[in-house]
């Protein structure tokens, strides 16, 4: 029962969480659940790169992985249900696995995965359509059934009528970008495309062909798509910009949090934002914690003083914990849960 890359992802998350969240938290992270708790945990425990990166996994997939890791003695169950500590042998296996198959450098779920899904559907369909047009073929099954994607590509092709020139531009753009990433990742990306001549390979087919772990192939594929988005700010390619022109690239915050963020920037206090938006004060506090995690320039001193931040951070460091209740009780309940959570957002590099 050897470990696959999915197991390594689970093990790495549990190592970073350090017994402070359950296996269910890993499930929600991998699924990309856009709840305040999951998004905050992703920032607090430095696991945001995994956000949404295994969206099709099931609870049984997580359970099977946890069982496997426990049977190998890489995890030790804790007294609290569904929580685990990574053992010394588990940490050693994790280090070795990540040295052999490191997480791809530009692959970041919280930053890019939502936009990457849109980009891939549009790009892969555009490649397929242009390939068939060049061969004079009108009979084929589109690579996606997604109506929004089908409509977008149809509209785009109707606005740009020189399809031969478009195909050349698309080829040049893909070639230029793929030269800048690892050869294997570029190969995986290219073989995932469907053209007039062949159907794109699945992750399993590519894993068999490349003699590689299927989950690692899957991650490397998405890493190649993420690189296109990562390079967008410096990119001068009109076609790539067009493919993402209407896609919101700042995916770290939930939509509701973005609305709160706009009001915070206008100087509204928490209570007033809650009244205007007809939301609970606790919900607005959740939003502010999210904002603090994902907006480095956001100052929290209006909510918790610099001196109080230091006290909270020093206690958390001394006790090696991010558990809010433990910190609050240890500091004799001088600070609210909100203040402690907020102070910890500025300490997210610690205690991995």
Swiss-Prot record:
CC per GO annotation: cytoplasm; nucleoid
Swiss-Prot/TrEMBL keywords: Cytoplasm
Predominant cellular place of this UniProt entry's protein: cytoplasm
InterPro entries according to UniProt: Helicase_HTH, YpbB-like
Compartments (UniProt record): Cytoplasm, Nucleoid
Pfam families named among the record's database cross-references: HTH_40
Keyword Cytoplasm attributed: yes
Keyword Cytoplasm on entry: yes
Miscellaneous comment as given in the Swiss-Prot or TrEMBL entry: The stop codon of ypbB overlaps with the start codon of recS, suggesting they are translationally coupled.
Assembly mode: Interacts with RecS and SSB (ssbA); the 6 C-terminal residues of SSB are required for interaction with YpbB.
Protein name (database record): Protein YpbB
Organism field: Bacillus subtilis (strain 168)
Highest classification ranks of the organism: Bacteria, Bacillati, Bacillota, Bacilli, Bacillales
Gene symbol of the encoding locus: ypbB
């Amino acid at each position: 029962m050897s470990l696959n890359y999915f197991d390594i992802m689970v093990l790495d998350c549990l190592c970073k969480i350090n017994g402070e969240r359950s296996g269910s938290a890993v499930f929600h992270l991998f699924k990309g659940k856009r709840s305040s708790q999951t998004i905050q945990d992703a920032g607090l425990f430095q696991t945001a790169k995994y956000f949404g990166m295994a969206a099709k996994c099931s609870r049984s997939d997580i359970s099977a992985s946890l069982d496997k890791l426990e049977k190998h003695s890489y995890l030790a169950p804790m007294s609290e249900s569904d929580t685990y500590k990574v053992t010394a042998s588990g940490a050693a296996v994790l280090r070795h696995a990540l040295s052999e198959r490191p997480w791809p450098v530009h692959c970041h779920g919280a930053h890019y995965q939502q936009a990457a899904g849109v980009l891939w559907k549009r790009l892969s369909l555009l490649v397929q359509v242009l390939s068939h047009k060049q061969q004079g073929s009108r009979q084929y099954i589109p690579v996606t059934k997604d109506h929004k994607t089908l409509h977008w590509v149809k509209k785009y092709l109707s606005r740009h009528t020189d399809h031969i020139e478009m195909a050349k531009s698309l080829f040049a753009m893909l070639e230029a970008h793929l030269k800048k990433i690892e050869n294997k990742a570029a190969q995986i990306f290219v073989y995932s495309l469907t053209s007039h001549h062949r159907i794109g390979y699945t992750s399993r087919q590519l894993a068999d062909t490349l003699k590689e772990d299927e989950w690692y192939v899957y991650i490397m594929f998405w890493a190649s798509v993420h690189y296109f988005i990562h390079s967008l700010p410096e990119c001068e390619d009109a076609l790539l910009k067009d493919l993402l022109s209407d896609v919101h690239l700042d995916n770290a915050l939930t939509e509701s949090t973005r609305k709160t963020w706009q009001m915070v920037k206008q100087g509204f206090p928490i209570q007033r934002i809650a009244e205007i938006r007809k939301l609970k004060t606790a919900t607005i506090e959740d939003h502010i914690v999210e904002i603090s995690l994902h907006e480095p320039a956001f100052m929290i001193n209006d909510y918790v003083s610099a001196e109080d931040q230091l006290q909270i951070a020093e206690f958390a460091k001394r006790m090696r914990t991010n558990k809010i209740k433990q910190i609050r009780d240890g500091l004799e309940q001088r600070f609210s849960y909100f203040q402690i959570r907020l102070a910890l957002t500025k300490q997210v590099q610690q205690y991995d």
